[in-house]
């Protein structure tokens, strides 16, 4: 059994947490996040920490409590520090540039791709082959990074494509005659 839910989430200085029924709101220096917690989890805010307990009689209450703890911890870290994902473009002629709330991608197709960024996510290109996505919402920044990577995932023979900065692409050997 996982014991994730037994550890409380500490609230750092400058972060304010309000609980309204099953809806939790976290405010910090970088913004505000709100989430509705599953009814199988009892959440309490006391002594500068958020504590979680499963509701008695619910089958998967411990699992839901662990999930709620992880989600709320990500909210607290997001509003205090923020999250970022780095993408690399590997391939001849693969380029990216940011224009307002759009990321213009040239990935070897006959047409350029334009990816619209959702509200709350910012992008920058330190070079033509790098994209840095930032947000206070870990789930959202990961989703946007996955969507951009999905346009041209790294292929195993030459390694060309869009990859995460820390991703290792397994390479295959070419077919022998």
Swiss-Prot record:
**What is any Pfam family matched here?**
Ribosomal_L6
Q: Among the record's GO biological process terms, what is one?
A: cytoplasmic translation
Q: Which domain of life is it from?
A: Bacteria
Does the record carry Plastid as a key word? no
The answer to whether the entry has keyword RNA-binding is: yes
What InterPro entries does the record point to? Ribosomal_uL6-like, Ribosomal_uL6-like_a/b-dom_sf, Ribosomal_uL6_a/b-dom, Ribosomal_uL6_bac-type, Ribosomal_uL6_CS
Task: List, alphabetically, the Gene3D superfamilies matched.
Answer: Ribosomal protein L6, alpha-beta domain (3.90.930.12)
Its keywords, alphabetically, are: Ribonucleoprotein, Ribosomal protein, RNA-binding, rRNA-binding
Gene Ontology MF, one: structural constituent of ribosome
Q: What exactly does this protein do? A: This protein binds to the 23S rRNA, and is important in its secondary structure. It is located near the subunit interface in the base of the L7/L12 stalk, and near the tRNA binding site of the peptidyltransferase center.
Q: Which PANTHER family match?
A: 60S/50S RIBOSOMAL PROTEIN L6/L9, LARGE RIBOSOMAL SUBUNIT PROTEIN UL6M
> Which HAMAP family does this UniProt record tie to the protein?
Ribosomal_uL6_B (MF_01365_B)
Give the quaternary structure. Answer: Part of the 50S ribosomal subunit.
Q: What is this protein called?
A: Large ribosomal subunit protein uL6
Organism field: Shewanella amazonensis (strain ATCC BAA-1098 / SB2B)
Coding gene? rplF
